[in-house]
């Protein structure tokens, strides 16, 4: 009797384990994300060379280190270069050339709370990316970052021969000895603006114009946001918005940005080969026109000489940054978010202000040398870790 009971108990245990195992497999099958066959093959190739895990976690942190949580500290070793010796800076970013009297804003480095950022080495960057193509795609903040990286590399290898072509929409800088080319593709909305019978139409569902130029790069750094806030047909560059079959004069700009960025995400998923190309999103660069955000009502970036202390911005987060995070989370392609928003919000002192050469007050872009050098240092760290 005892033998029969023990046998029955053993059979019941095996049956329960079989059922649970089958349920686990079914659940795993249901939760498995959809990945195209091409990207399955590409991801397998990346994993095979030890990079898959790093790329797949790229939306969050790098090697357990949050590069973007920290504070600004005074650093006498900064800046990385002298603007007067860099031939690639546009006047609108060359604040010292146009008379900015203070230089303390150049002497701050970003210190993450949980790790140390490796110092940028332009020659090491060129050697690692020898024969490669790097492209920044976006608006004038992409221009800001592109020129910064060009100057940072140039300061490390000042005697190397370069080929510099600046055109619209595609510019390039090639470091000939290393066969490394930095491209800039200017497209403020990422999605298309087309000429139709009614006028210029911002098409939230289309990326066709020029997007072939983005393909087959080794590193892509995308950016978009500032132009989505522009109003008035001259400033915004379009007359109508097309959303599916609807054609309208205007719509909620955050909603439009969300739809346009979703279209961009779909383009990346369909066209980027992750075994060849690493993809970054530059993150949302803030402005400093409203001093109430940092408890100085009626102030702007004009006359600001020091960054905010601490690691949080009094004005809080930006809704556009949440949209970027949401869109990236829905994509199959691993896109690393270069989450520069908060650390840039703390730098109310780093804008051209009245020293951009055009007579206005610019609290949108950034002086060079300056904050975009830190963006590139963090890009360098993310690529190195």
From Swiss-Prot:
Signal peptide: none annotated. It is found in: Membrane. InterPro entries: TBL, TBL_C, TBL_N. A motif (GDS motif) lies at residues 138-140. A motif (DCXHWCLPGXXDXWN motif) lies at residues 362-376. It comes from the Eukaryota. It is a single-pass type II membrane protein. GO terms for molecular function: O-acetyltransferase activity; sequence-specific DNA binding. Pfam families: PC-Esterase, PMR5N. One of its GO terms (cellular component) is Golgi apparatus. Its main location: membrane. One of its GO terms (biological process) is jasmonic acid mediated signaling pathway. The chain crosses the membrane at residues 7-29. Keywords: Membrane, Signal-anchor, Transmembrane, Transmembrane helix. Belongs to the PC-esterase family. TBL subfamily. Contains 2 motifs that are conserved in esterases, but it is unlikely that this protein belongs to the catalytically active pectin esterases. May act as a bridging protein that binds pectin and other cell wall polysaccharides. Probably involved in maintaining esterification of pectins. May be involved in the specific O-acetylation of cell wall polymers. This is Protein trichome birefringence-like 37. It comes from Arabidopsis thaliana.
